[in-house]
Amino acid sequence: METAKHFGSKLRKTLAALLATMALMAVLLPGALAVDLNVDVGFYFKQSRGGTCTLASAAMMLRRRAYLDGMDSWVDVTENGIKSTAWSGGLSHSFTYNDMHVGYATLPSGKAAKTEALVSILAEHPEGIVLYDRTRPHAVLLTDYTNGVFYCSDPSNGVASGRVPLSAASISIGGASCYCCL
């Protein structure tokens, strides 16, 4: 009888340990498997010619979304590759590329309102957004807002490559007026 009691106690402890391990995995595993889009694995590039900053920024945004969705063809998303559906003398305000629909919207006025709106938009769009500054005129891929800093990839050849603080880019939040996103 003593052996059955011991076995039951040991079984309960083993099951409790197993359940605790599974609970811990459920909490930690999603973070471990999450894709870090802030690590450049080839998302970013410079515009191929003058006047195509919006097209290049849109291609980088689509590339990041395709990567995030696990599409092997994300590397094939290029400025020239999206041009036939996304370009009409400028970036189209609405287009679809490989089942990814891009739309256009305007930002509120005032730097504080723009900042608040962009933080919220980026939280919903980890692939980033195409941010356009009509005062320049120029566009960048706004990628994230981390530790109080906006980051972007500026397709202009006069700015460092890759993900850089928006303050190092050729546009500003204050001058931004509109954006495109998925």
Label every PLM stretch briefly.
Residues T3-L18:
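Bacterial N-terminal signal peptides that target proteins for export
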Residues K10, L55, C180-L182:
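Residue-level detector of bioactive/disordered segments in secreted/extracellular proteins
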Residues A17-V27:
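Bacterial N-terminal signal peptides
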Residues L28-L37:
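Sec-dependent signal peptide cleavage junction
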Residues D36-Y44, A59-L182:
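Conserved active-site-adjacent core of cysteine acyl-enzyme catalytic domains
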